[in-house]
Amino acid sequence: MFQFETTTACPDTKARTGKMTTAHGDVATPVFMPVGTLATVKSLSPEDLVACGAQIILGNTYHLYLRPGCDIIDAFSGVHAFMGWNRPLLTDSGGFQVFSLAKLSRITEEGAAFQSHLDGSSHLLTPESVIDIQNRLGSDIQMCLDQCIAFPAEKGAARDAANLTTRWAGRCRNRWQETGGPSRCGLFGIVQGGMFDDLRADSAGRLVDLDFSGYAVGGLSVGEPIETRLAVAEHTLSLLPPDRPRYIMGVGTPAELVELVALGADMFDCVMPTRNARNGKLFTSFGAINIRNACHAKETGPVDPACTCYTCTRFSRAYLRHLFMSRELLAYRLATLHNLFYYINLINDARAAVAAGRFAAFRKAFYAAQQATGPTGKEPCAGS
C-alpha cells in the first residue's frame, strides 16, 4: 500500500507539497526523516521522536540483518513492533554501507559480498535478498540495492556502477512484485551516475521506465563540493516524474535542505543532526554553535530562543554545557532532541510556507537569520 499525490506547487521555485499514504499512516511532504539505523535513533525513544514531529523514520537493512537479525525481528512481525514505532518506516537497502566498508566488500553481478564488521563472517546481499529482508522488516518504503561510488571517480567506473544499479533495480522490482510488495509498501529506485550529467540522465531514464513508486537521488555527500552536489541534485531532480516522490539521500546541512526543497525534493535523511548533537554542535535559527565553548558556561538563556523543543523550553546553555563537560549521558539526549526538532521543523516550516504561497519569503528570511550575529545581536560565541 503506497500512494503519493502533490497538493501545492510554488509559483516562484520548483518547491511543492504532497502526501504519501502508507500502511502505517500518511506523511506530508517535504519531510525530514530521522536516521534510526539499528531500529533506534540514538538516545531517543519513539515518544521523543513523536514529540519532535517525526512522521517517518529510516532504518537500515544491512545493519538490522546483521544485528539483531531477521529471526529475532520475525518474532515481532517486523521492526515497528520490535522498536515500538507505529508510524511509517523507510529502510535503506545497505548499498551505502557496503560502499563505506569497501575494504570488506566485493561487488559482482550477483550482488554485494562482504564481511561483517561485527565478527568477520561472510555474507552476500543480492537484489532479491534485500527485498526479502525488507519484507521481513515490515518496511513501508523499501529501497533497491544500489552501487555507490566515491568522489572523485572516473567516468567509466561511474557508468559501470550506474548500469549495475539499474540491472539490480530491475531484479529488485521483480522480487517486490513476486512477493506481493505493491499491496503492502512502496519501492524506490536509486539514481546513480556520479557527478556526470549524462550518466545521471541515462540512469534516471531507465529507472523511470521500470516504473517505481518513487525515486531517490543517491551517490551524493561522498566528498564532492557543495556546489557540485546541488548542481547534480538539480539536474537529477529535473529528470524525475512529477507524480512520484523524490528522495535526496544522506544530505545535508540546513541550508542545503532549504535549497533542495526549492529544487523540488520531497524527502530527506541525514545523520548530521544526531551525530553533531553528540559532539556538542547544535543547529539554531541563527546558525550553529558549539555548546562546549567556554563562552556558554554562564549563559542563562536557551540554545535557541526561537525554539520550542523540550531542551530549549527547560534548560539553559550553561546547564547543557555542564552536562557535556561532565560527560553526562543526558547531554546527548537533550542535544539530539534539540537538533532533530530543529531539522524536522525547518522542513515543516518550509512545507507550510509552500502551501501558503510564501516560500520565497521563507527562504529569504532563513538566510537572513542564518547570517545574523546571534539572537541577542552579538556573536553568540567566538569559534562557535
UniProtKB/Swiss-Prot annotation:
Manner of cofactor binding, per the entry note: Binds 1 zinc ion per subunit.
Catalytic residue positions: D92, D269
Pfam families according to UniProt: TGT
Pathway: tRNA modification; tRNA-queuosine biosynthesis
EC number: 2.4.2.29
Quaternary context: Homodimer. Within each dimer, one monomer is responsible for RNA recognition and catalysis, while the other monomer binds to the replacement base PreQ1.
Family: Belongs to the queuine tRNA-ribosyltransferase family.
Designated name of the protein: Queuine tRNA-ribosyltransferase
Gene name, Swiss-Prot/TrEMBL: tgt
